[in-house]
Structures are given as structure tokens and as C-alpha cells.
Amino acid sequence: MPRGSRSRTSRMAPPASRAPQMRAAPRPAPVAQPPAAAPPSAVGSSAAAPRQPGLMAQMATTAAGVAVGSAVGHTQGHAVTGGFSGGSNAEPARPDIAYQEPQGTQPAQQQQPCFYGIKQFLECAQNQGDIKLCEDFSKVLKQCRLAKGLA
């Protein structure tokens, strides 16, 4: 029976010890649960962190695509409008340059103003994608040519 008494005392002791543990366990359990909940949110935020750069990368790619598309669209638009409106203005200016170069025997005073106008117009046409931006240079060149009798 000594065994029985031991087991009874041990049986009696654990329920007594379990009761305080149960009372103590609920108090630390709520405190322990928020930190346990925080690591999953930390894991969730670390999992969300790679997703956000992915979103930003997609946005950057979209913005780059828009920029490239805009540049291509502007270039095509300038090619179409330059082909219709600028083709007639740019071609007569080139023969004038070829025409003025052989006239190097004439006085420089007659040749210089129109040559400078042609030079400005051609530089504008080469530097600008849209020939319409060079209309002022074209007008000055036409006036010079009319004044000099080159038209």
C-alpha cells in the first residue's frame, strides 16, 4: 500500500499543481499570443516586401513603355507631317546651297545674308524633329531670296 499512498499523493499533488498552472497559464497565454501573432505578421510583411518591389517594377516598366511609345509616336508623327509639309521646304533649300556655292566669284555681301539664312534653316531642320518649328527660318530665307532676286 505504500505504493498506493504514493500514487494517491502524487495524484493529489498534480491536480493541485495543475490548478495553479491553469490559473497561471491563462494569464501568460494572452500575453504570449500577441507576440506569437506578431511574428506571422512580420513574416507576412517580409513576404509583402518582395511583392511591393514587384509592383513598383511593373509600374516602372509600364512608365518606360509609355515613354518609348510616346517617343515612337512623336517620331512617326513628325515623319508624316515633315514628309508632307517639310519636304517642299527642305528640298528647295538644298539646291540653293548647291547654287550658292558655285557663285563664290560674286561679292560676299550679296551671298552672305542668304547663306546665313540657309544655314540657320538647315541647322533647325536637322536639330528639330518637326520642320514646322523652323517656319520662321524658312520665312526669313524666302524673304532674303526674294530680296536678292534668287527666287
UniProtKB/Swiss-Prot annotation:
In what residue span(s) does the CHCH domain sit?
111-151
Coiled-coil stretches, from where to where? none
A single cellular component GO annotation: nucleus
Q: Is Transit peptide there in the keyword field?
A: yes
| Positions with biased composition (Low complexity) | 10-26, 39-50, 100-110
* Cleaved signal peptide residues: none
| Biological process according to GO | mitochondrion organization; positive regulation of transcription by RNA polymerase II
Which residues form the organelle targeting sequence per the record? 1-9
InterPro entries, sorted: CHCHD2/10-like (IPR055304)
Q: Which UniProt keywords apply?
A: Disulfide bond, Mitochondrion, Transit peptide
Q: Where is this region: Disordered?
A: 1-50, 75-110
What's a single GO MF annotation on this record?
sequence-specific DNA binding
Locate the compositionally biased regions of type Pro residues.
27-38
Q: Where does motif Cx9C motif 2 map?
A: 134-144
Question: Which parts of the sequence form the motif Cx9C motif 1?
Answer: 114-124
Cystine bridges: C114-C144, C124-C134
Keyword Transferase recorded: no
Q: Which PANTHER family match?
A: COILED-COIL-HELIX-COILED-COIL-HELIX DOMAIN CONTAINING 2/NUR77, COILED-COIL-HELIX-COILED-COIL-HELIX DOMAIN-CONTAINING PROTEIN 2-RELATED
Protein name, entry field: Putative coiled-coil-helix-coiled-coil-helix domain-containing protein CHCHD2P9, mitochondrial
Q: Which organism is it from?
A: Homo sapiens
- Per the record, the gene is CHCHD2P9
